[in-house]
């Protein structure tokens, strides 16, 4: 099993649907990978419809690991101060091939790509620009000559 760092570059959003009657939204993104959730900052400019984050979110990722769901669930939320946050929509980013390539080559990258955001009715509510990379961590364990705590020496 290989261990590495999965990094998501959350760049921007475009045409996000308003969830408030007042027309302004304060969008942020929650990204879940294998039960671990990371949150972006809240974008405040442009009334929230075309936000820019430029955030980097990271996970420790094992491949192959437990379970078969090698995907990122990306949820766009509207931050509300006096009530619970509103769900705007979500997208799924599949990363299995990225992890496979990263394990094979040491590093792999999905260049920034547009992902459609859909709401609970599967209606289009905007898009996100997201890049993803995976970098294998160096093996800090055996050096090839150590076994069970003993290091073999050569006898002449």
From Swiss-Prot:
Induction: Regulated by ARR2. Ca(2+) 3 binds at residues 80, 83, 86. Residues 1-108 form the C2 domain. InterPro entries: C2_dom, C2_domain_sf. Keywords: Calcium, Metal-binding, Plant defense, RNA-binding, Transport. Its cofactor is Ca(2+). Ca(2+) 2 binds at residues 20, 78, 80, 86. This is 16 kDa phloem protein 1. It comes from the Eukaryota. GO terms for molecular function: metal ion binding; RNA binding. Gene3D superfamilies: C2 domain. It comes from Arabidopsis thaliana (Mouse-ear cress). CDD domains: C2_putative_Elicitor-responsive_gene. Ca(2+) 1 binds at residues 20, 26, 78, 80. Binds to both sense and antisense RNA. Can also bind sheared DNA and dodecamer DNA with a low affinity. Interacts with mesophyll plasmodesmata to mediate its own cell-to-cell transport and potentiate RNA trafficking. May play a role in plant defense signaling. It holds the Pfam family C2. GO terms for biological process: defense response. Binds 3 Ca(2+) ions per C2 domain.
